[in-house]
Regions:
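C-terminal substrate-binding/active-site "lid" region of AdoMet-derived donor-dependent transferases
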Residues: 112-171
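Conserved short alpha-helix immediately C-terminal to the canonical SAM/SAH-binding motif I
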Residues: 31, 52-56
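Conserved SAM-binding motif I beta-strand of class I
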Residues: 43-48
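S-adenosyl-L-methionine
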Residues: 1-17, 55-99
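Conserved SAM-binding loop of SAM-dependent methyltransferases across substrates and taxa
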Residues: 30-41
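Conserved class I S-adenosyl-L-methionine
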Residues: 18-27
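A short SAM/SAH-binding and catalytic strip from SAM-dependent methyltransferases
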Residues: 102-115
């Protein structure tokens, strides 16, 4: 996630400053927690449909918030950045949530169906504002309209193997 964020900041001249991060199909919430440490987003939201993963993410969130609160309280002078904003996890279908305020949408879409990818593109075409960035893994969003550009597709080693990362940006 750090490499992807650095890439986006470099390519788009810090265009995500003070934005909102959404993780579609957030699982147990690792990308949301990672992004909260890497960048000071206004809002970080993970959206997960599966009960077990959603419930597990709530426990991880609580542990993370307790840990970070203690570290900032005890070592405030060691940190040269603001305390991360709180993260939030929503239980439900990410296609039923509002995406109008997103700056970055992340989808580890390796296992998403073609139909799911088309539904994500359809919703992004309808709701995302100019400058919104969508990051997908393994599969790109082929049905985005002409207002979107595919900025890059590059391969990175993940803990589970190699993935192609696609960066889409609304003009």
């Amino acid at each position: 996630m750090a490499y992807i964020l650095e890439y986006i900041n470099h390519e788009f001249n810090g265009a995500i400053r003070d934005g909102n991060f959404y993780d579609l199909g957030s699982g147990i919430g690792k990308p949301v927690i990672a992004m909260s440490l890497l960048h000071h987003f206004k809002k970080l939201i993970g959206i997960e449909y599966l009960d077990n993963l959603f419930n597990y993410s709530l426990g991880i969130k609580q542990n993370y918030e307790n840990y970070i609160e203690e570290r900032f309280r005890k070592n405030k002078d060691l940190f040269n950045f603001q305390k991360p904003n709180s993260t939030d996890f929503l239980h439900g279908n990410f296609l039923e949530q509002n995406w109008e305020d997103t700056s970055i949408i992340f989808a580890n879409s390796t296992c998403f169906s073609e139909n799911m990818m088309n539904n994500i593109a359809k919703k992004a075409n309808k709701e995302c504002k100019s400058g919104t960035i969508i990051i997908t893994f393994t599969k790109r969003l082929t049905t985005l309209n002409a207002e979107w550009e595919l900025r890059d597709g590059f391969r990175r080693i993940m803990t589970w193997g190699v993935a192609t990362i696609y960066i889409h940006r609304r003009k």
